From Swiss-Prot:
Pathway: Xenobiotic degradation; nylon-6 oligomer degradation. It catalyses: [N-(6-aminohexanoyl)]n + H2O = [N-(6-aminohexanoyl)]n-x + [N-(6-aminohexanoyl)]x. It comes from the Bacteria. This is 6-aminohexanoate-oligomer endohydrolase. It comes from Agromyces sp. (strain KY5R). Gene3D superfamilies: L-amino peptidase D-ALA esterase/amidase. Belongs to the peptidase S58 family. GO terms for molecular function: aminopeptidase activity. Heterotetramer composed of 4 alpha/beta heterodimers. The active site is at T267 (nucleophile). CDD domains: DmpA_OAT. The gene is nylC.
Length: 355
């Protein structure tokens, strides 16, 4: 009997291989020169490679400060889109949280990095030529990761960087890896000596008229897992060359009556964007379903030392069929089925970030 895990979208994607080479972050400094110590100039992030996607009305831009390194990633939807927010964990860094947004800003810099979202808001107001009618308000929600532990500066994404990320936004492209908000993201913080750098990741699927785009910046205390149950990023022991699941460290700590040394300062921020129209209840459940599914690719997840936020966004362009279209009937095409597929797309994005 074949027990090899099968990708739920195996007919679309043959699978994602993660480079096994270690990317150790090194011990944290927790301080250093800040923004005023440098002549900062935003740099367009190009990352490891560019994901090409076909989603009209959605543009993405990423910018960073090399001096950090830290950055911001902006998902711009000029027409605006309904949004549901699912935030969990003990240290959520979130601003806005609106149920309708024109842009989502993901950034490093912990709470200080929320300033990048203000830069996006200001730039959108300028594009409106400072018209302030209520119906014209440009809404921006932001979420941040704590990325100071993987670098030796106190540089954070400010208004200028958020503005630059918006200016760099283009349709159909997303920079994978160390780019934008993922410049100094890391995973597997059971022990700082075993922490590894991740990045930002995205994946896209089109099924008929249905479009799904997943974007994620994994910066968890946990490790990144592939579909075979293998730890592919985080908690890497340089002496043995082995990555292991944190549960083994926790078991040893309890057996030895020594408190686990899990480090604070962790967050995974993400967005799942679709063109499928859903009711407010369905959209909220869609957000929860996809966010919960990420436990498969990040373990542990949603801990009291994390602050995880997912934005579920719909451009409301198409309706799912309301009558059975196959022998599987209604169960094959509904918001729950959409969430199941989107969950696999998000797992692909997590693996791309760790790649």
């Amino acid at each position: 009997m074949n027990t090899t895990p099968v990708h739920a979208l195996t007919d679309i994607d043959g699978g994602i291989a993660v480079d096994p080479a270690p990317r150790l972050a090194g011990p944290p400094v927790f301080g250093g020169p800040g923004n005023d110590a440098f002549d900062l100039a935003p740099v367009r992030s190009t990352g490891r490679e560019m994901l090409r996607f076909d989603f009209p009305g959605v543009s993405i831009g990423a910018a960073h400060y090399e001096e950090g390194p830290t950055g911001a990633t902006v998902i711009h939807i000029p027409a605006g889109a309904r949004t549901a927010v699912d935030a969990r964990g003990g240290a959520v860094g979130l601003s806005g949280g609106y149920d309708f947004n024109h842009a989502i800003c993901l950034a490093g810099g912990a709470s200080y990095g929320l300033e990048a979202g203000a830069g996006v808001s200001g730039a959108l107001l300028e594009r409106l030529e400072y018209r302030t009618g209520f119906a014209e308000a440009q809404l921006v929600s932001s979420a941040v990761i704590y990325d100071f532990s993987a670098r030796s500066t106190a540089v954070y994404p400010d208004k200028a960087l958020g503005r630059a990320a918006l200016e760099f936004a283009v349709p159909g492209e997303f920079p994978q890896g160390r780019a934008g908000a993922g410049m100094s993201a890391s995973a597997g913080k059971v022990d700082w000596d075993r922490t590894e750098i991740t990045g930002q990741g995205a994946a896209f699927r089109r099924l008929g008229d249905v479009r799904i785009l997943a974007v994620v910046v994994p910066n968890p205390v946990g490790v990144i897992m592939d579909r075979a149950g293998t730890v592919v990023r985080g908690n890497y022991d340089a002496q043995t060359g082995v990555r292991r699941h944190p549960v083994f460290d926790y078991q040893e700590a309890f057996a030895e009556q020594v408190p686990p040394v899990t480090e604070a300062g962790n967050t995974t921020i993400s967005a799942i964007v679709t063109n499928v129209r859903m009711s407010p209840v369905e959209l909220n459940q869609f957000a929860k379903q996809v966010h919960s599914s990420m436990h498969r690719g990040i373990q542990p997840f949603h801990t009291d030392m994390d602050g995880d936020t997912l934005f579920a966004v719909t451009t409301d362009e198409i309706d799912l069929p309301t009558t059975p279209g196959s022998s599987r009937g209604r169960l094959s095409v509904n918001a729950t089925a959409l969430g199941a597929i989107a969950s696999e797309v998000m797992w692909d994005a997590v693996l791309e970030a760790g790649k």
